[in-house]
Amino acid sequence: MMIPAWRPDKAMNIEAPEFASYVHQLEQVSGVTITKFADMVDALKKRHDFFQANGCKLSDHGIEEFYDEEYTDSQIETIFEKAMRGQQLSNLEIRQYKNCFLTVMAEMDADADWTQQFHYGAIRNNNTKMLNQLGPDTGFDSIGEFNTAKAMAKFLNKLNMEDKLTRTILYTLNPCANEVIATMLGNFQGGEPGKIQFGSGWWFNDQKDGMERQMNALSVLGLLSRFVGMLTDSRSFLSYPRHEYFRRILCNMLGNDVEKGLLPDDRELLGRMVEDISYNNARRYFKFY
């Protein structure tokens, strides 16, 4: 089964030179004339509905970090208008806008009963010379270091207080934050098993050591048996074998713990757990069928 996912990063990255041109493209595809931020939200809602009509059940947001800067509706409208005129935005304005944008998208996902994903912790396009020569996403990104725990907690808490915190998966690119996320999950669980998930190791951590570190942190501080397991980009179809790679690493970890006497030597119990992590948990969690 192949279904689309919702990735509205271009609407979030208000500081990008191509932001205004993207908004004009959004106007064309949505049929909504966009002169203010509220108009863009209306246009995105139409596209959100279109994605849902075509089977979409997940959103994904690529962010450097979480944001907690306070804002008002009038401030966001002013920031949006400045960006559309090509005016320079301050760092505070960018962060206010992104906080507002992610909140609006999260509320939209909650209303649609989607799962939201946040991939955070990358610093991108570090080599300007190569960016100018080859463009973005050509191999000049790296792991970032951000003090984001408080902002993450504040963001999730705000949604939770509004009853707008849908199923959420948090992915960190920096393994130093593994324990941060593993402990953050417990603050906002409720309503359904494993509602808030620690996402599998991704990008630079999408290898044996990275996968083991992520799963070890989750098993020590959370509940590994509720884990929804591995993921991959559908656009990178040749990377699908990483699911088999992941399953072998998972089984090896559990087998080693059995040999050390840390887990019961119960093939039925552990076999069912592996099946759940490999397939059943994700099927139930994402409500595919």
Language-model segments: residues:
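Extended, charged catalytic domains and RNA/DNA-binding interfaces, predominantly
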Residues: 1-115, 120-143, 158, 227, ...
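Divalent-cation-assisted or electrostatically stabilized phosphate/pyrophosphate-binding catalytic cores
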Residues: 146-152
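Mid-to-C-terminal alpha-helical segments outside catalytic/metal-binding sites
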Residues: 224-226, 242-289
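A structural signal for short secondary-structure junctions
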Residues: 162-164, 190-193, 211-212, 219-224, ...
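C-terminal functional module detector
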Residues: 107, 111-113, 162, 175-193
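Extended C-terminal subregions enriched in glycine
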Residues: 168-178, 203-210
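Histidine/acidic-residue-rich catalytic or RNA/ligand-binding cores of hydrolases
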Residues: 69-71, 126-135, 177-186, 208-215, ...
